[in-house]
Amino acid sequence: MATKKKSSAANKGDDRQKALDAAMAMIEKDFGKGAVMRLGDDDRPPIQAISSGNTAIDIALGVGGFPRGRIVEIYGPESSGKTTVALHAIASAQKTGGIAAFIDAEHALDPEYARLLGVDTDNLLVSQPDTGEQALEIADMLVRSGAIDIIVIDSVAALTPKAEIEGEMGDSHVGLQARLMSQALRKMTGALYNSGTTAIFINQLREKIGVMFGSPETTTGGKALKFYASVRCDIRRIQTLKDGQDAIGNRTKLKVVKNKVSPPFKIAEFDIMYGEGISRESSIIDLGVEHGFIKKSGSWFTYEGDQLGQGKEKARNFLKDNPDLADEIEKKIFVKLGVGAAAAEAGEDVAMDVPGADDPLTDEAVDLVPNVDFDDD
């Protein structure tokens, strides 16, 4: 009786599998190969990223940069460094042969400043749209082309609906921008994933009226962007850097408040120097000291016995003049923290260096095994 029940269950399982295979075959015929698949059969590589151009930010993001095929939101107060971070990401993408686009809804992009940050302005695609609908339609068309690696929309607050532009001053247009963003993000999300394009939305802060508890700060454009964004970064200026009485830059803090590709709430602190952008070398020194690769004795910084300089500014200039050394220290930091491509390469090297891991058992090796007679008492 038990055998009969087992046989019946097995037959039922076979029938279900055949029905599933038939359904999957029909789905693939109608919607294309890969429309439905088992997760274990997905041969896509791990999450790829576009480096932010700064070691501290790449580590805080957890995957070595801004994830490809995802939406990223960067928000903060005025002059906190939002556009600077986005332009550095564009420069980083261009250095690896990528194509970048910048939707300048604020009509405030400074080409000379972008050039100072390392952006190839001759090959940067720029659009200065008249309306929010036009801006998002252009962005969607560029993404669907499949040729764009990174696109920046600066900013969400400046995406003004057409009805508002054509209307009179003082007219009420409640929820127009929120509906516009919600519709655009619904359309763009799938296209971004399929094309591997990173979309960075820069956003501004507003204050909610009458909030008694919690933070009154909120971002513009409704709630859709908060849901669709895989990464949200809150950026703040925390200190003014001075050389004597002259201000030469800002100490800036970036907090990853939402992260779908790595643990969230990590914080990166870095220096933004006026006329230069984010100082990569300064972050390498900070992280190098923190993780023991760079020794600090008094005001002197040393690396493997070699002096980098007295004072952080001289050490920073030394690393700037010796980019190979800066790359070496940065790679060691990434490997130790298990972040980015450097860590993945190090893992592969360790696996390949295991002695005898791939050696076949040859006849000579077999002959070296002594004969053991288990019948001897």
Swiss-Prot record:
Cell compartments where the protein resides: Cytoplasm
GO process terms (BP): DNA recombination; DNA repair; SOS response
CDD domains: RecA
Cellular-component GO terms for this entry: cytosol
Main location group: cytoplasm
Binding site for ATP: G76, P77, E78, S79, S80, G81, K82, T83
Keyword Endoplasmic reticulum tagged: no
Any Pfam family the entry gives: RecA_C
Keyword annotations from UniProtKB, A to Z: ATP-binding, Cytoplasm, DNA damage, DNA recombination, DNA repair, DNA-binding, Nucleotide-binding, SOS response
Function in brief: Can catalyze the hydrolysis of ATP in the presence of single-stranded DNA, the ATP-dependent uptake of single-stranded DNA by duplex DNA, and the ATP-dependent hybridization of homologous single-stranded DNAs. It interacts with LexA causing its activation and leading to its autocatalytic cleavage.
Protein name: Protein RecA
Organism this protein belongs to: Corynebacterium aurimucosum (strain ATCC 700975 / DSM 44827 / CIP 107346 / CN-1)
